[in-house]
Amino acid sequence: MKITRKAATQRRHRRIRRKVFGTPERPRLAVFRSHRHIYAQVIDDVAQHTLVSASTLDRELREAFKDIGTATREAAAVVGRSVAQRALQAGICQVVFDRGGKLYHGRVQALAEAAREAGLQF
């Protein structure tokens, strides 16, 4: 039986989530990538609470996506900078990166690098 790409992603995500856990001191930066959008959340897994979030659907960021679109590396970088700025404003300096079963490449990589450049440590 052939393993589909979706099944492989889900297996990878389960394997990653067994090891990656967000605490109040070092929450988890979870990234979800769809075909058209990208979402990033900083999550405290102990309290099961989302502390900050950003996505290509945010009203504050919509102007930035008029020319570049929402499914590009540039859009992912904008989201990464935004989530990092919001996390730093909330007093969160260090996070654990959860790539959500996706490969560390393309939009996921662009988001992570932009968040690091904006001052988030992981």
From Swiss-Prot:
Task: List the InterPro entries hit by this protein, alphabetically.
Answer: Ribosomal_uL18_bac-type (IPR004389), Ribosomal_uL18_bac/euk (IPR005484)
What keywords are annotated for this sequence in UniProt? Ribonucleoprotein, Ribosomal protein, RNA-binding, rRNA-binding
Q: Name one GO molecular function term.
A: structural constituent of ribosome
Q: Could you state one GO biological process linked to this protein?
A: translation
Q: Which GO terms describe its cellular component?
A: cytosolic large ribosomal subunit
> Has keyword Ribosomal protein?
yes
Tell me the domain of life: Bacteria
Summarize the protein's role: This is one of the proteins that bind and probably mediate the attachment of the 5S RNA into the large ribosomal subunit, where it forms part of the central protuberance.
What's this protein's family per the entry? Answer: Belongs to the universal ribosomal protein uL18 family.
The subunit structure is: Part of the 50S ribosomal subunit; part of the 5S rRNA/L5/L18/L25 subcomplex. Contacts the 5S and 23S rRNAs.
What name does this protein carry?
Large ribosomal subunit protein uL18
According to its UniProt entry, this protein's organism is Synechococcus sp. (strain JA-3-3Ab)
